[in-house]
C-alpha cells in the first residue's frame, strides 16, 4: 500500500500568505532551513496507478501538478488517476479543493452523513456542483462499518470517530456529533499492514488508542507545538483545544502519546505555519528526531 503526502501543512499552508511569524518570514527571506508546504491532503493506492484522495485541500490543483501519478494517463485527452475521494471532516481546508476539481465531475465522494449535511448547508459544495456533469456523488460512511472502494479494492477503510471540532461555519461548532470528525484505520488486505490516519486529534480515548496500537504506521496531527502557540506568537487567540488539535509538547500531548507506540513508524502531518518543528535546525525538530518521530513533507511517499 502506497501513501503519497500531497500536502503536509495545516490551513494556510507554509508560508501562510499573510503571515510574518518567525517561520514564515524566515522561509521567505531564506534565513531558516525549511521546506514550503501546501495544505493537508494525501492519496492512497494499492497498485501505484489508481488513487484514492483523502481530503481535498485548497491547493489540490498545485498538488496534482506536482504529482504526475495523479494526472490523466497520456492515452486520454482528459481525466485523472484519482478514482474516489474520502473526506474525514467538513473543514474548509479539507474540502475547498472539491471546487477546483469540478471539471472532472462526477466524483465519487465518501463522507459521513454529518459531513455531507455540513457540505449541503453551511458550505453547500454538493449543491453548488450539481450542474457540473453530475457533481459529487455521495457515498455515506457509517462510523460503525468498514468499507472498501472499488478503485483500490485491496484497501479496507475503518472509520474511527475522534474527539475534535466541527468547522466554524457549522451549527455544530463546539458540540460536534461523532460523525463530524473521523480518523481512518487503513488496511492492505493482501498483506495485513495498516496505517492510522488522523490529521486532527483533539482528545484521546480507548478506541483510538486501540487502533493506533494495531497500526504499522501512524500518520497523525502535528498542528501545534504548544496549545497556546498562536497567542504566544501574537498571531491569533485560538488554542489548539479550541481548534480540535492536541498540541505536541503539552504534559499529556501528542509526544507523550506517541511514546506509547515504540514499534510503530510515527509521522506528523497537518503542521501549522507557527510550529517550530518546521525549522529543520530547531531544538524542537531535534527533539522529534531523537524520539524517532518524522515530520512529513509534500511529495513524501510512505509504503506500508
UniProtKB/Swiss-Prot annotation:
CDD domains: PQQB-like_MBL-fold. GO terms for biological process: pyrroloquinoline quinone biosynthetic process. Keywords: PQQ biosynthesis, Transport. Pathway: Cofactor biosynthesis; pyrroloquinoline quinone biosynthesis. It comes from the Bacteria. InterPro entries: Metallo-B-lactamas (IPR001279), PQQ_synth_PqqB (IPR011842), RibonucZ/Hydroxyglut_hydro (IPR036866). Disulfide bonds: none annotated. The keyword Transport applies. The keyword Transport applies. Belongs to the PqqB family. NCBIfam families: PQQ_syn_pqqB. May be involved in the transport of PQQ or its precursor to the periplasm, in association with PQQ biosynthesis, but is not absolutely required for this synthesis. PANTHER family: COENZYME PQQ SYNTHESIS PROTEIN B (PTHR42663:SF7), HYDROLASE C777.06C-RELATED-RELATED (PTHR42663). This is Coenzyme PQQ synthesis protein B.
Amino acid at each position: 500500500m502506497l501513501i503519497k503526502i500531497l500536502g503536509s501543512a495545516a490551513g494556510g499552508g507554509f508560508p501562510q500568505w499573510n503571515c510574518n511569524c518567525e517561520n514564515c518570514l524566515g522561509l521567505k527571506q531564506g534565513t531558516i532551513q525549511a521546506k514550503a508546504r501546501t495544505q493537508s491532503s494525501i492519496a492512497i493506492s494499492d497498485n501505484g496507478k489508481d488513487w484514492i484522495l483523502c481530503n481535498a485541500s485548497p491547493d489540490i490543483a498545485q498538488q496534482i501538478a506536482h504529482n504526475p501519478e495523479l494526472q490523466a494517463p497520456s492515452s486520454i485527452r482528459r481525466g485523472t488517476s484519482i478514482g474516489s475521494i474520502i473526506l474525514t471532516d467538513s473543514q474548509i481546508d479539507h474540502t475547498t479543493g472539491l471546487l477546483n476539481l469540478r471539471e472532472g465531475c462526477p466524483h465519487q465522494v465518501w463522507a459521513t452523513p454529518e459531513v455531507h449535511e455540513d457540505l449541503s448547508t453551511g458550505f453547500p459544495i454538493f449543491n453548488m456542483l450539481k450542474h457540473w456533469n453530475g457533481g459529487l456523488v455521495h457515498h455515506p460512511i457509517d462510523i460503525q462499518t468498514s468499507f472498501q472502494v472499488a478503485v483500490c479494492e485491496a484497501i479496507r477503510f475503518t472509520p474511527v470517530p475522534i474527539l475534535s471540532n466541527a468547522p466554524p461555519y457549522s451549527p455544530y461548532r463546539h458540540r460536534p456529533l461523532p460523525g463530524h470528525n473521523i480518523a481512518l484505520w487503513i488496511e492492505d488486505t493482501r498483506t495485513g499492514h495498516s496505517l492510522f490516519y488522523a490529521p486532527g486529534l483533539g482528545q484521546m480515548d480507548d478506541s483510538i488508542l486501540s487502533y493506533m496500537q494495531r497500526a504499522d504506521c501512524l500518520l497523525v496531527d502535528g498542528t501545534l507545538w504548544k496549545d497556546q502557540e498562536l497567542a504566544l506568537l501574537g498571531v491569533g487567540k485560538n488554542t489548539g483545544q479550541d481548534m480540535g488539535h492536541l498540541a505536541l509538547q503539552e504534559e499529556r500531548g501528542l509526544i507523550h502519546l506517541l511514546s506509547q507506540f515504540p514499534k510503530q513508524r510515527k509521522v506528523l502531518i497537518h503542521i501549522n505555519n507557527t510550529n517550530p518543528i518546521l525549522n529543520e535546525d530547531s531544538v524542537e525538530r531535534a527533539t522529534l528526531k531523537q524520539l524517532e518521530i518524522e515530520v512529513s513533507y509534500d511529495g513524501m511517499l510512505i509504503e506500508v
